[in-house]
Amino acid sequence: MDKITRHPLYQTADIIKRAFLVNGFHLYDNGNSPEVVSADKTVELYALPEEAVLRPVMLEEGRYVLRTSLLPTEISRMKGRFPIKELICGRVYHAEDKELPGHMYLEGVFADRDIAAKDWEVFLDRASKEIYGISAKSVLEPVKKDMFRIVIRKDDGSEVTLGYTGYGNWLARALLGVEDEEIKVWLLTIDVDSVAMDLHHKESREVLYENLMATLKMCETEVPVCGDTLADQVSNILREKGYTEYIGSRIYQADAYIKMNMFQGEWDTNNKGMMLVEPLGKDGGNIWLPTVLTPGLEEVIAENYKAGEETVKIFDIGHVYLPGRDGKEPTEKIALSIGAYGPEIDAKSFKADMDELLSRLGISNHFFIPTDIPIPYDTKHCWLVMDENMSYLEGNFGGIGENARENYGIGVLAYMANFEIEPLEKKAASEYYFVPPELE
């Protein structure tokens, strides 16, 4: 049986989420909210210290940015009965981190009547013991007015910063609809990358984000994903089948689509992502956001092939972005990319894996229609995913085309799949709630 694994960053995020959930918090969002926001909606809800402030990645001539915080676009939807105890997980971006601008963050809101700093400190201490063990002690260290560093003192005498917390400012209170002065609004920010490096003994973020199977296969766990979205279900199913989740590139180089044989010419606008104002990457070559995840997938397949891996089964779930046309807002979607190669993997076995995945998601009425049109694929082994009405479910899979394999240096037959999550969610829901006419 293949090892069941979980990326150390995602393992850490789940540990922290569960630490707050068992103490009464609700997981408001598990990575679904948009990562691209209008530049005029970038606001500050509390006064983070300078070392925790992120510089936004500007897009499309400065009209949009990749978010630097999770709460600003979501906090107004959290209005309701007190206490409010909400948690958000997702990716934020820092323009100063040229090679790895994406960070996994957890942010939270705790609002109720007369919450003193000591009350919040006691709560955070309980949560920290769920993360670091019962010998750990959490304390709030003031860094400036109304702002504290959450310091974890471990049983070996060492200390680590869990995150930052402080009182929400007037804007945070207004967005929450809080007018009563006796109601305190505490906000929380945790850089999951930093905690993951500590828990998994990674000396740098570069090591944390390595995608070599030799490293990722060491992170064994059969614990399910902390979440109940369809993307979470996908992760559990694929992990159970021996697929390893990686974290692919989220900002592509200029030739990404040409390299995977997906770009057909200047007229082909489907594969031109949102442009960065300032290029990122090691050599300043990363210039646009992905419209699909498959270029990143092929990079990781190639990296592992060159490292001598005989068998690779991987997947990635992340956001993709389509630029707005004719003055319209950009479109953001959550996508799934799956890849595999190995002596026991061929077109038939990979197709069977895709069939099992869809069936276990509750999508029984799916059909695979062969096609020789998509140029990134091996045209002898390529399928579109359709429903019973022959409507496209925004999914396709097959062999990676010869040109792409040559461009990436992949010396074996390899296979990939590309899905959008929302159409799968809608299809699964329609089948789950379907009532035959004779039973209505």
Where do the protein language model's features map onto the residues?
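TRNA-recognition modules of translation machinery and tRNA-sensing kinases, especially anticodon-binding
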Residues: 1-440
